[in-house]
């Protein structure tokens, strides 16, 4: 049996050429996109995807060309929020896979659009004992392919809806060295602020610019009198941003009308 050292060349696979070609393909896509911004949260359930969709909508309203990459591979929701579900039949052309066109012409690529049905889970392997390293490698490869194979065209902004936590920013930064920065999203609960602080610290150590922090569900809007009240007890989020020396972008109230809206119409006017 031959060992790895006994092999001559690459066996005809031209693996180096393939890697170079993949890198050039990704680079050609990204070069047509002016600004790439990651939307992050320390934990789930803070409304990150809804805010991503609303930011994209606001940018589109101002005449910018916008795309969203749903990087939350195991819990994709951007397609649903913007009216593009898994019923969309993706079309492959010479230029690549055509992204879904959501609300206001926002270009979308999401794992949700690649699944057979709405209740189909993302399964990276049939092996029950698959290691975390193996799954993480497959996730990283999937992100690269979604970025490189999608025909984004020329965009002013590509928003990247990240999964909860701070560990996946490593993959995004390696794929997009020119990442403009990250927008952190939190709710004013002590637990959420605990995790978003970790995310901020991680980005600072990695040199990822923090564009600012959005405080979601800052208050509760009464559906009857429209008065606002506090929902959570925690540190004042503005003080948190001052302590971490990052911009405070603003706060958004918890509004039940958003949850009552239909898919593709979850936007503030």
Where are these regions (language model features)?
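C-terminal lobe/tail of nucleotide-utilizing enzymes
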Residues: 1-24, 200-269
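Phosphate-binding P-loop
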Residues: 28-34
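Residue-level signature of catalytic and energy-coupling elements of molecular machines
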Residues: 33, 44, 70, 78, ...
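Walker A/P-loop phosphate-binding motif and the immediately C-terminal alpha-helix
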Residues: 35-73, 200
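Short glycine/serine/threonine-rich phosphate/pyrophosphate-binding segments
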Residues: 48-54, 75-79, 162-171, 192-195
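Phosphate-binding loop that captures ATP/GTP phosphates
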Residues: 65-66, 71-121
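Phosphate-binding/switch loop-helix module in NTP-utilizing enzymes
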Residues: 115-173
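Conserved Switch II/interswitch segment of TRAFAC-class P-loop GTPases
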Residues: 153-166, 178-199
């Amino acid at each position: 049996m031959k060992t790895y050292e006994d092999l001559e060349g690459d066996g005809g696979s031209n693996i180096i050429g393939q890697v170079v070609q993949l890198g050039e393909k990704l680079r050609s896509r990204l070069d047509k996109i002016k600004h790439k911004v990651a939307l992050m949260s320390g934990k789930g359930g803070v409304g990150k995807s809804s805010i991503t969709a609303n930011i994209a909508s606001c940018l589109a309203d101002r005449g910018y060309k916008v795309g969203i990459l749903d990087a939350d591979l195991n819990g994709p929701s951007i397609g649903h929020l913007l009216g593009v579900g898994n019923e969309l039949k993706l079309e492959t052309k010479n230029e690549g896979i055509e992204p879904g066109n959501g609300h206001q012409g926002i270009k979308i690529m999401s794992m949700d659009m690649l699944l057979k049905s709405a209740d189909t889970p993302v399964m990276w392997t049939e092996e029950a004992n698959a290691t975390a390293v193996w799954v993480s490698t497959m996730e990283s490869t999937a992100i690269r392919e979604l970025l490189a194979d999608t025909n984004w065209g020329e965009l002013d902004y590509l928003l990247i809806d990240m999964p909860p936590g701070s560990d996946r920013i490593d993959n995004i930064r390696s794929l997009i060295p020119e990442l403009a920065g990250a927008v952190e999203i939190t709710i004013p609960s002590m637990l959420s602020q605990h995790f978003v602080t970790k995310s901020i610290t991680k980005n600072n150590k990695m040199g990822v610019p923090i564009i600012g922090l959005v405080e979601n569900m800052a208050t509760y809007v009464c559906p009857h009198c429209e008065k606002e009240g506090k929902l959570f007890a925690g540190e004042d989020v503005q003080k948190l941003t001052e302590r971490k020396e990052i911009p405070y972008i603003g706060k958004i109230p918890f509004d039940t009308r958003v949850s009552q809206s239909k898919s593709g119409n979850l936007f503030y006017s």
